[in-house]
């Protein structure tokens, strides 16, 4: 299967000026966010400080490390290592870690810090996080339970997002030689692949399994419009997650899944290449966008370009460049904001979902992170992130 670039859409001519602008915004935010974390989403495009208990607290340090890679300024290294210390303390005391999102917390922050600086505290934090992630393992069904009390039938489920958490487990096997981390990551990924991808190549946000037998039960949404729609960010996690699963396993089924879920996402983009918050909506609908989803997909395309033949890799890089151009030209932060990417959506309430409404048409910290990652991938083709 192949995916063709969009007709008559420009690629990003030069990512460097946009990286410079993003790095300047990160630098300006350091006085507020060196010893505190950013909240998951902004209020009127300004982030509030928080205590670092959120599942999103790894994305701001991840931005700091990318600013360090781009600029070489030691002020970013200093700030990044302070966040590593905080994350090490958090995992040691088990504060806000009883869930599956250890990868989102510790991969862009601590595995990055370890790779860049050799900081042993960062390595220790990430390995402890991998151990914590395995405490969510459910042998009956073969998956990592996302949230809630273990073995409670009301919480006996996994979610599409977790594909992005799995690289932490593969990394832990690489670091320790213990195959259990990677083995369970692969089993979870295969369980997700078998159940979360629908026949039309859209995705279910969450999927329930039977606590007694491990049999698949049903897909439900938490943050999408309804149980049958495709939440834009969930579809984006599937795109990038499939690329990463293919990288780590070389299982050709993941290559097939990547093309299927990517085609679904791209075919439902509005004219400006930035989706509404659920892919059920398109041009003409009066709904908020989710710019973070396009940034995630651009990074997934650039990841998969490393693993396919040259002609197809060029197609994937071109599409990623077109998406990043759309983001940089129309959605990048301007004016009085400490975010990098405008018009993200964390969770929008509908009569049919179960989420708490937060961060609608705001900056979201993972949107900023993946926008920066996409720019850095384009500017430094030999650089690879830490997923």
Roles of regions detected by a PLM:
Residues 1-387:
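Glycan-recognition and catalytic cores of secretory/periplasmic carbohydrate-active enzymes
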